[in-house]
Amino acid sequence: IPLRLVGSEMCIRDSPIIFPLSNPTSKSECTFEEALTHTDGRCVFAAGSPFPDVTFQGRTRVADQGNNFYIFPALGLAGALVQAKHINDNVITEAAIALADSLNKEESDADRLYPRLERVREISNYIAFRCIKILIRDGLCRDNGLTASMNDDELYKWIAARMWLPDYSH
């Protein structure tokens, strides 16, 4: 990692933003451990490749993987379910906000940027729900008012029932 870049970031903010996005892991601009070491553990880190957890200053830190698998499936699901005319900037912004809002207390306390991967279906359902609410508000649905007639609980369950579940047991 170029120390001059980290130094510049540390002059601007208390928690430098370090997003080494190159793939594969062997080509990454820096490792999670290097980022923590060069920022005294204060960095905001997400990588394009997976990195192992690091114990730094007696605390186990989790390297988040910045990837589109949290947002794009939910955007596609929302658009398909309501037969959206198009996906506007409001919907994309709402997807990003919904992802940020989906962190639970444990994840927030661990300074995670993204929810745990094990929760991806739950998160996708939540993001799709929030996106559909914006699609309804902005008049972009072509579902003959079906989703607009549902209350929030009905809509949330309706989305969940239509999510694809990979089942290769037969």
PLM regions: where:
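Single conserved hydrophobic/aromatic residue that forms the stacking wall/gate
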Residues: 1-7, 12
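Adenosine-phosphate binding glycine-rich loop
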Residues: 16, 20-152, 158
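Active-site loops and adjacent core secondary-structure elements that bind or stabilize anionic groups
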Residues: 10-11, 157-170
